Swiss-Prot record:
Name of the protein described by the UniProt record: Histone-lysine N-methyltransferase set9
Biased composition regions of type Polar residues, renumbered to the chain: 291-301, 371-405, 688-698
Record function comment: Histone methyltransferase that trimethylates 'Lys-20' of histone H4 to form H4K20me3.
Catalytic activity: L-lysyl(20)-[histone H4] + 3 S-adenosyl-L-methionine = N(6),N(6),N(6)-trimethyl-L-lysyl(20)-[histone H4] + 3 S-adenosyl-L-homocysteine + 3 H(+)
CDD domains the record matches: SET_Suv4-20-like
Segments forming domain SET: 117-231
Region (Disordered): 263-414, 682-718
């Protein structure tokens, strides 16, 4: 009886999936995301929100003082649990068992910052390109069969229902399948950051009831990613969708080339550059003839520190993936016309339209035929028809009409008249004089005698547009109720007003404006089961006062606008079907890609320390190290992968205040990274050009030194003479200035009275009587 109770109590005290997910989410948020981590760890619960009580400065200070400089896990645990965020969460745990489980999981994450930890948490975008996921990188050499210290975790068995729910929420990134029991488990802790690889360098080992450890299968070098094998069919059957590094190097599974694509060869960029190589500059022209920036002209040999990645415009990126909205319903025979239309649209830019067609913006929707059509139907209703479009005021509104050839004119009657039987509709293929036939009324009645316009427009059939449509026959359109239906209007021709005046055209003027509707009325007597008649011979419509059409062929090149030779060469004569297959992954498409340069002033940078590429936002000033090296330097005070002093003879100073370190390039390095010449070098080259170089050319080094010394001595004498001359002039000026005479107030008053001045300095006014007396005397 005691044994079942013990096992029952043991199962009862096991961690559940909800508890373990809650512990792991808040600990990864506090000890990884808020420890100078440049991205975020994916959380197990979608409802998780970062705690406001977790502050980065407070967390990193505890890590530095109590885990890195003076390792003490007990003190660090006490300090971390005293922070607002973790203290608040720990208070929500009701039982001591839950609190102990949470503290044990906390110690697993604290251990990854100890100086003797052989790995470090990194990030990679290999799997999704646009988002970063966690990974594990070795920062010291790990021998084969060595248990990777602190890379441990805890697992919990999940049910199939929980597994299905996690897969639907895309949270199945930490699932492992037992090779013996075939049960699925979710493992948490630092071990969850190890990614899958088909040829992994480590393996998962179960320790105890729910513990997990990782042991190296072979020697692991510094900077190498630590990987494990999740399952044989984790990423589809036989891992057919795996995107690991092994599959990437072998071009298999998720990296296999798409049918019709050539296999991508390994680039020599992966090789380490030699010491003699210099950075490559992408500048097309040197501003200055300096030899300081002699670089290779092959960009794949020595990539620049700041490589130039061309950003594709949105239209270029989506050109190969977009599909036609107007031809969404076209199937079968309409595929040829559709591919031809798409080839023209992709090969050459369209005209700038004055009024965009609605058929190029909205999908084609079958329209029910009206029971009472009238001649006064609006143009808006007409333009919504899938077989109609218009041109106005000599402006080409066909977005894909550039480079297309217009067939010859066809004359139709604008008046609805009864017909006897159905015949075919002409269809013109490009460069072919043959006539394809569809079901339309056989004969057309002539229009009433009307005075022609002074310059009537030219009417041409829209055969190219009809070829790109659904090719729905009139019999299918008009098949409906059993009772006879009234006449129906269909679009057969297109009107353009920029062509010369035809000799065989007469139309009735239906509008006061210059717009001519593209719908010319054709009536068809709709019957319940009308026989379908197809003919391959050209049609001769009986049109009065109009010459008959002898042939239907493409118009001359003079009717189409001129096109550059480059565009003409880019358009092949054969069909260009649009590929709808999904684009496969290409090796190394997650580095130096323009997909991550969506924001302005964002650039790919090469790390000066580990030579890895990274994306820097707001790259007005270029950073010198990647986020991984920068985070390590902020935490440990040393450059990656150093964590502590190597011995008593190591004199390198540890700098824990990251604000004292300049993380950007110097002005000279910035200029060279951008392919420019530093201003000191530029000024130095100008000074050398302005000096007396020809006089010293060919002289020995000793004579050059003597000449330069004489020049400096002469320049110094000249400067001294100039200062002496200025001093003499100042002395002479001072000697010529008269010495001031000191006068008392009485003397000033007497002098002013003698000069006839007042105290204020104004002249005294002399009266006229005194002036006359002075004149008499």
């Amino acid at each position: 009886m005691t044994k079942p109770q013990g096992t029952g109590g043991k199962k009862k005290n096991q961690l559940t999936l909800a508890q373990l997910a809650a512990y792991d989410d808040i600990l990864t948020d506090a000890l990884v995301d808020h420890a100078y981590y440049w991205t975020t760890i994916p959380k197990n619960r979608t409802s998780y929100h970062p705690s406001r009580g977790i502050k980065e400065e407070e967390i990193t200070k505890i890590i530095q003082n109590h885990l890195i400089v003076d390792p003490d896990i007990a003190t660090a645990e006490e300090k971390l649990l005293a922070t607002d965020g973790l203290k608040r969460f720990c208070n929500t745990l009701k039982t001591p068992r839950e609190q102990n489980d949470f503290k044990a999981h906390l110690r697993r994450y604290m251990s990854i910052y100890l100086p003797d930890c052989p790995f470090e948490v990194n990030a990679t975008n290999r799997y999704t390109i646009v988002t970063y996921e966690a990974s594990i990188t070795a920062r010291r050499f790990i021998q084969r069969n060595e248990t990777i210290k602190y890379l441990a975790g805890i697992q919990v068995v999940i049910t199939p229902e929980e597994e299905l729910e996690m897969s639907l929420r895309k949270k199945d990134f930490s699932l492992i399948v037992s090779s013996r029991s075939k049960s699925t488990s979710l493992f948490m802790g630092p071990a969850r950051f190890a990614n899958h690889d088909c040829n992994a360098n480590a393996r998962l080992i179960t320790r105890g009831q729910a513990g997990i450890e990782i042991i190296a299968c072979r020697n692991i070098e510094v900077g190498e990613e630590i990987t494990v094998t999740y399952s044989e069919s984790y990423f589809g059957e036989n891992n057919c969708d795996c995107l690991c590094a092994t599959c990437e190097s072998n071009l298999r599974n998720g990296w296999r080339p798409v049918d019709g694509e050539a296999a991508v060869q390994k680039s020599i960029e992966d090789e380490q550059p030699t010491e003699s190589s210099t950075p490559y500059s992408f500048r097309r022209k040197r501003r200055y003839g300096s030899t300081a920036l002699q670089a290779s002209r092959t960009p794949s040999v020595t990539p620049d520190m700041r490589p130039r990645v061309l950003r594709k415009s949105q239209s270029q990126m989506m050109l190969g993936e977009r599909t036609s909205t107007t031809d969404s319903a076209a199937q079968g025979a309409g595929a040829d016309g559709q591919s031809r239309k798409r080839a023209l649209e992709m090969g050459t830019p369209p005209f700038t339209p004055t009024k965009k067609q609605k058929t190029t913006q909205y999908p084609v929707v079958p329209i029910a035929l009206s029971t009472a059509p009238s001649r006064g139907s609006s143009d808006n209703e007409t333009s919504k028809s899938p077989l109609s479009f218009s041109t106005t005021n000599d402006n080409v509104t066909d977005a894909t009409s550039q480079g297309s050839e217009s067939p010859g004119p066809i004359i139709l009657s604008p008046e609805p008249t009864p017909i006897k039987q159905a015949i075919g509709l002409l269809k013109q293929e490009e460069g072919v004089n043959e006539v394809a036939v569809q079901q339309v009324p056989e004969a057309f009645t002539p229009p009433p005698s009307q005075p022609t316009e002074e310059e009537p427009p030219m009417v041409r059939p829209a055969f190219e547009r009809l070829a790109a449509r659904d090719r729905m026959s009139i019999a299918n359109l008009i098949s409906g109720p059993s009772s006879p239906a009234p006449p129906v209007v269909f679009s057969v021709a297109e009107v353009t007003t920029h062509r010369p005046k035809p000799q065989t055209l007469q139309l009735q003027k239906t509008d006061q404006t210059a717009t001519i509707s593209t719908l010319q009325t054709v009536t068809a007597a709709v019957q319940k089961e009308a026989p379908v008649v197809k003919t391959e011979s050209p049609i001769k419509p009986t049109v009065g006062q109009v010459e008959k059409i002898t042939q239907v062929q493409t118009t001359t090149k003079s009717c189409t606008p001129s096109k550059p030779k480059a565009q003409a060469a880019a358009l092949p004569q054969h069909h260009m079907p649009v590929s709808t297959a999904p684009r496969g992954r290409v090796p190394h498409d997650y580095t130096l890609t323009p997909l991550l340069l969506s924001e302005p002033e964002t650039a790919w940078i090469m790390c000066t320390h580990c030579a890895s590429a990274f994306v820097q936002k707001n790259a007005y000033l270029t950073k010198s190290t990647c986020p991984r090296c920068e985070r390590h330097s902020k935490l440990y005070g040393y450059m990656w992968p150093k964590t502590e002093k190597y011995g008593p003879n190591d004199k390198e100073e540890r700098i824990l205040d990251h604000r004292m370190i300049n993380r950007f390039l110097t002005a000279e390095e910035e200029a060279r990274a951008r392919g420019r010449v530093y201003w000191r070098e530029r000024m130095g080259s100008k000074g050398k050009q302005g000096s007396s170089a020809p006089s010293t050319k060919g002289t020995p080094a000793g004579e050059k030194n003597e000449q330069s010394a004489k020049q400096e001595q002469s320049q110094g004498q000249y400067v001294q003479e100039r200062f002496a001359v200025r001093k003499k002039v100042k002395v002479q000026v001072r000697s010529t200035v008269p010495t001031p005479v000191i006068m008392t107030k009485k003397d000033e008053v007497a002098e002013a009275a003698a000069l006839g001045l007042r105290r204020s300095g104004r002249a005294r006014r002399v009266s006229a009587k005194l002036a006359d007396c002075e004149l008499d005397f």
